[in-house]
Amino acid sequence: MKITRHQERVWALQILYSLDISSELNIQKARKTCREFKYKKVLDKKRYYFEDIVEGVINSRQDLDSIINKYAIDWDVERMACIDRNILRIALYEIESGLPVGVAIDEAVEIAKDFGDSNSPKFINGILAKSIED
């Protein structure tokens, strides 16, 4: 089974969402959750991209949230929909890690269409677009 980067981003979002709503965004819980996730998906033991995203977002969360707060006018990251804030964190982490900006934004918007509410794609696109202008 070929696993796409898009699928791995979705898996990362699902894991980050579950950790975020349970207030367990810490690296130990993330690693345990990734191991359990791989077992449930019957994936082999190699390291997957979604694990890099999950760990990277958790390790960089304060910096990522500062960026989000800077560009989300009149919104605090903690008051945003959990899905939206984690899509933004993933996209910003990937941009910081060298993924082309256009790819990161396109992926974030597509994932927002599938998992967010009707306003999520526009909201996410706007914040990401503002953040790269600087």
Swiss-Prot record:
SUPFAM superfamilies: NusB-like (SSF48013). GO terms for biological process: DNA-templated transcription termination; transcription antitermination. Gene3D superfamilies: NusB-like (1.10.940.10). InterPro entries: NusB-like_sf, NusB_fam, NusB_RsmB_TIM44. The keyword Transferase does not apply. It comes from the Bacteria. Keywords: RNA-binding, Transcription, Transcription antitermination, Transcription regulation. It holds the Pfam family NusB. GO terms for molecular function: RNA binding. GO terms for cellular component: cytosol. Involved in transcription antitermination. Required for transcription of ribosomal RNA (rRNA) genes. Binds specifically to the boxA antiterminator sequence of the ribosomal RNA (rrn) operons. Belongs to the NusB family. NCBIfam families: nusB. This is Transcription antitermination protein NusB. The lineage of its organism: Bacteria, Bacillati, Bacillota, Clostridia, Halanaerobiales.
